[in-house]
Amino acid sequence: CVHGKGNFLVNQIGESFSSVFSMLLFLKQSNFDEVQQLRRGLEMQSLLLAIQTADCTTAAAQAQWRQTLEPLGKLVESMRQATGHKRVTLDSAFHEALIQCSANRLFAVLQKAVSSLCEAAIENVLTAATDAQWQTLVDCHETIYQSLLNRDAQAGMAAIDQHYTQPFSDSLNTPLG
């Protein structure tokens, strides 16, 4: 099955990226701030690409766009009531779904490789976040979702920027690896 071989190759490439990023961190040639900058850039570009390529010229196309974004909306709703480790799972799923909206497979591979580097740090921060910090983060996710629905790149980019400059983001400045 050719499709299966394609998935195998994509997974191998993703693991290779992850290995390179891990080695850079291990050798102190990179740091968590640079990883976060890459994640932020991937998400901003994914948002822009999704908005730019969305066909909303007809009512049917608009309905299709809303259906494409529905998983993001459901994730945001679930996030509102989440606690503990469920926060981590939903946050990760939201970021993965955001990247998927771009339909850029390379972005998805890079996002997965980069996110794997900081899973533990993010898990520690999200599970320890106060309810107020968590709700601020959920509000960022809601704004990102709404900006995609409304095709408002400026609002979406501002929300992504805010997401990565949260009050508890300083807690993430811990060594990785």
Specify the residue positions occupied by each region the protein language model found.
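C-terminal all-alpha effector/ligand-binding and dimerization domain
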Residues: 69-76, 89, 115-177
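Short linear motifs at protein or domain termini
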Residues: 1-42, 48, 52, 176-177
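Residue-level detector of well-ordered alpha-helical segments, enriched
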Residues: 34, 38, 42, 64, ...
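Short loop-to-helix capping motifs
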Residues: 103-105, 151-152
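Short basic (Lys/Arg) and small-residue
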Residues: 98
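Amphipathic alpha-helical segments enriched in hydrophobic/aromatic residues interleaved with Lys/Arg
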Residues: 57-81
